[in-house]
Amino acid sequence: MRASRPAVHPVEAAPPPPAAAAEGPEAQVEGAAHPRGVRMKDPPGAPGTPAGLGLRLAQAFFAAAALAVMASTNDFPSVSAFSYLVAAAILQCLWSLLLAFVDIYALLVKRSLRNARAVCIFTIGDGITGTITLGAACASAGITVLIGNDLNICAENHCASFETATALAFISWFALAPSCILNFWSMASR
């Protein structure tokens, strides 16, 4: 019976080869070949790193801020693009908080999140939420320009709130892009 593998693997440095350890540090620096099976360090911003946690928290913060600003207006449900932005911000906030908790766990137990399945799930999830968030931000930006510049009815609407929520959604997407790219790079480099 095969046992299941955990999704989080420890990353430890391999012991130096016996010949190199006996010759001293000069021999290790000059002609040392990396031992087989040793993984390189995770790049900053990858899942399970402090920078990755920072990116996830930034994504969640800006998505929550966009949601709060848009929900503070009473007429956002009348425009479907703004309702789409609210739904996308909720999804982005939940996804980012979920992965922030995973990053916190990985940092607390000092484990790496370079498992192929985990990286694949992170990449697909980041791609989906990123596409939805960018689409919602673009749609909201288009409606905001229509209301403000083309129809000139900002006096009747909350244009400043709409613009602020749209800008925060774009910032949330900009915080998501490095995570998605790093996850895709990690997945593709296997």
From Swiss-Prot:
It holds the Pfam family CASP_dom. The keyword Cell membrane applies. Residues 1-50, 103-126, 186-190 are cytoplasmic. It comes from the Eukaryota. Residues 1-12, 20-31 have a biased composition (Low complexity). It is a multi-pass membrane protein. Residues 72-81, 148-164 are extracellular. InterPro entries: CASP_dom, CASPL-5. Residues 1-31 are annotated as: Disordered. It is found in: Cell membrane. Keywords: Cell membrane, Membrane, Transmembrane, Transmembrane helix. Its main location: membrane. GO terms for cellular component: membrane; plasma membrane. The chain crosses the membrane at residues 51-71, 82-102, 127-147, 165-185. Belongs to the Casparian strip membrane proteins (CASP) family. PANTHER family: CASP-LIKE PROTEIN 5A2, CASP-LIKE PROTEIN 5B3. Homodimer and heterodimers. This is CASP-like protein 5A3. The lineage of its organism: Eukaryota, Viridiplantae, Streptophyta, Embryophyta, Tracheophyta.
